[in-house]
Regions:
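Intrinsically disordered, low-complexity, positively biased terminal segments
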Residues: 1-18, 30, 163-425
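A conserved beta-turn-beta hairpin within the catalytic core of GNAT-like acetyltransferases
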Residues: 80-92, 102, 246-255
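Conserved active-site alpha-helix within GNAT-family acetyltransferase domains
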Residues: 120-125, 130-151, 292-308
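Conserved GNAT acetyl-CoA-binding A-motif
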Residues: 111, 116-131, 280-291
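Active-site rim helix/loop that mediates acceptor-substrate recognition in acyltransferases
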Residues: 25-82, 196-223, 324
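Conserved acetyl-CoA-binding loop-helix of GNAT-fold acetyltransferases
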Residues: 92-116, 120, 265-277
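GNAT/GCN5-related N-acetyltransferase fold signature
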Residues: 53, 75, 97, 226, ...
Length: 425
């Protein structure tokens, strides 16, 4: 659908417009712009996959410079792990509208063009995003497919249970020494855990970006690696964290803030969590984006010392239902006809026969009677295997047309572990 708004134009940015693009986004998100962040953006942003709306009317624009956007969005080309392994995903980011131009339909227009182009060019079958506000993206067909737990652990009130034996050694090392271990462990984990993203090119630099202005009085990032043998041996777990020392009248009240913990073995999880919880001078260990099944809650002797707050994290949009459903595997054999409603992307409306198992899947349009009726947003929520179709049906978001079809399909969509996305993009 062409963008036809008097005085406004929508187009991808040019490479030399990136500083203004980045400054605009930071301003909308209530932050200042920093040169080091713009330099990182130069390595991450693909100008051809951006969209910006420019006010050319001379009225209402934030400044006289017409190269400053009034609305923006972009796509990062990433790999998303789904049940069965990684697939290409359009990682939607930088969605912003200037306060001078809100409530004018600019967000909907950008979402429309973005999804139309993905479909028309047969690019990624799946789009993903983190929602700044959870009420925004459902109307564009996104569903909340992952949840994360905010953890606040009173570390003096609990410890890893004594029956969990410890082997190997945890070492704290500089970033350059830790890097190969972090990369190796993460690659093992991300291929197996739905919701994880690849970190090719500059994405490790983005994940470990640690400017002084972000630290809020805490230390620089520190790196702990668990080695299965001596420090020169391979690693199977790591923690990336910062520390902030504070004292009150009773003594030290330091805080460990976790950026990321990954473990490819149970022994690694035991060792790295014991290290974090037993740190001297620390009263709390906090993590904003832990997996909902993070092992620490099962390892400690006093789980009530862990305060957990569950929040939505990764949202999934099936751009092309047939291609997306065929791109993952299924935990149990499935043969079901799904009737899909999609008010925003009419090409998805219809019935599809999905057949598949743990080795692969096929999904094709059909005229057969539907076994299930579901919205594209509900399918997005179920896509990574963390939200069951039966739970969505209990909320009225899935309708069973053939008895038994719901239970069978729900079992097939299931993932052995809930999906987790450890990084915001």
């Amino acid at each position: 659908m062409p963008f036809d708004r008097p005085g406004l134009t929508m187009r991808p940015i040019e490479a030399d417009e990136l500083p203004a693009f980045g400054a605009f986004i930071q301003g909308v998100f209530l932050s200042d712009v920093h040169d080091d962040e713009i330099e990182l953006d130069r390595r991450l942003v693909e100008p051809a996959r951006t969209l910006a709306v420019f006010d050319t009317s001379g009225s209402g624009a934030p400044i006289s410079n017409r190269s400053t956007p009034v609305a923006s969005t972009a796509i990062f080309s990433r790999e998303l792990t789904v049940p069965g392994g990684p697939i290409p995903a359009a990682a939607v980011t930088a969605v912003a509208v200037a306060p001078t131009h809100r409530r004018q339909g600019l967000l909907a227009a950008m979402m429309r063009r973005q999804l139309d182009e993905l479909h028309d060019t047969s690019q990624e079958a799946v789009a993903i995003l983190w929602a700044s506000e959870a009420a925004i993206y459902g109307r564009f067909g996104y569903g909340a497919a992952c949840r994360a737990n905010h953890l606040d652990i009173a570390s003096r009130q609990t410890r890893v249970r004594s029956e969990f034996g410890r082997s190997g050694q945890v070492t704290v090392c500089p970033a350059d020494e830790a890097a190969p271990f972090l990369r190796a462990v993460y690659e093992q984990v991300r291929h197996l855990r739905a919701g994880h993203l690849d970190r090719k090119g500059p994405w490790w630099d983005a994940r470990l970006f640690d400017p002084q202005w972000r630290r809020d009085g805490a230390s620089s990032l520190r790196f702990a690696v668990h080695h299965v043998g001596p420090p020169s041996s391979s690693g199977d777990a790591y923690a990336v964290y910062s520390v902030k020392g504070t004292w009150d009248a009773t003594g030290p009240q330091g805080v460990v803030s976790i950026r990321e913990v990954q473990a490819s073995t149970p022994a690694g999880a035991v060792a790295i969590w014991a290290f974090l919880l037993e740190m001297d001078l620390v009263s709390h260990v906090r993590w904003d984006r832990a997996a909902t099944d993070e092992p620490v809650q099962y390892l400690v002797d006093n789980p009530r010392a862990i305060r957990q707050t569950s929040v939505d994290s990764l949202w999934v949009r099936l751009v092309d239902v047939d291609r997306a459903l065929a791109a993952r595997v299924y935990a149990a054999p499935v043969d079901v006809v799904i009737e899909v409603s999609d008010p925003f992307c009419a090409w998805n409306v219809g019935r599809y026969r999905l057949t598949g198992d743990q080795t692969g899947a096929h999904c094709t349009p059909t005229s057969s009677d539907a076994d299930l009726a579901v919205s594209v947003g509900a399918l997005g929520a179920a896509y990574l295997g963390g939200t069951s179709l039966t739970s969505l049906a209990a909320a009225g978001l899935v309708t069973e047309r053939r008895p038994g079809a719901l239970a069978a399909a729900s079992s097939a969509f299931f993932a052995a572990r809930p999906p987790s996305c450890p990084e915001v993009f």
